């Protein structure tokens, strides 16, 4: 059913207002950032001689380089670890006969319900006892552990939806669990793995 002209105009106007509402704060910040240091424009005013060096000064004063490096290192280590562990774990929960599988999975579900604030103090004492305070491992290990419960649940639901015919055909051809996982399950699960990687990246970077 085609929309009427009035509906299209109203929808376009609402979208335009939404875009304007989202863009204006960024324009205001950019306008203020390009002014001479110590001055503040009234509203959104772009000077004829923008001071682009303000960004360099702010970068150096805030010492952004080591902070950015730390974030990159965390992401490079945490995201692959979470994706690998959760892919293997999700496959095991969905396809393999593991003793006490249901109980272990419930524990992962419980891990999703625990507020992070309740873990800060125990994590501090645990990291301190391991002698890892003021090291990158003090961030990497908790971030991996905190992202695994969600990743396990996410990947398990993905592998449970895999076509059983393909798995049975691979088994008839003599493929073991590892080959079935690597050659059949993993390629089919790439969309879910990509989504998990993006979500883990955002959680780690933030």
Model region roles, listed by residue range:
Residues 2-206:
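A structural signal for multi-pass alpha-helical bundles of membrane permease subunits
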